[in-house]
Amino acid sequence: MRASPPSCIISMPDTSAPHSVMMALGSNHADADALIEKAIQLMSRFITDLITTETLTTEPIGIQSGPFRNCLVTGHTVLDASQLIAALKKTERDCGDRKSLRRAHIIMMDIDLLLHDDRRYHTQDWQRSYIQQLLPQTNISLPPLT
């Protein structure tokens, strides 16, 4: 005699549903473009569906240094915000970023989480001209902060 199929199937919610994320990347090192490419490659380990904007040359904000190269990156991750921030900080270190270099105004790699699902981070950065210029190149459809 065969067992009859269960009368109901209970499914658990998918707790690993991907989160939409956006990060700002920047470097003022002579090899900034190569470092940005390296950071994107490293981030592909924990962020999928990566979309990268063009990379712009910008003037430094808040430090005396040479120009920066900046871009935005969007994608999806199963990491929560705190896990993602930790992974981004490790990516910065893997790109050579060190506190001692930052004290000398050399930023090998700076990665700021700007968006995790609907939560905005670094809200003061959203008004920066390069972020406003690059936002239309992303798949993010949020209105700018007012």
Model-derived features with residue positions:
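Flexible, gly/pro- and Lys/Arg-enriched active-site loops
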Residues: S7-C8, A30, P60-R69, T77-T146
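A structural signal for alpha-helix termini and helix-coil/disorder junctions
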Residues: R45-D49, D94-D97
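N-terminal beta1-alpha1 ligand-phosphate binding loop
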Residues: R2-F46, T53-E59
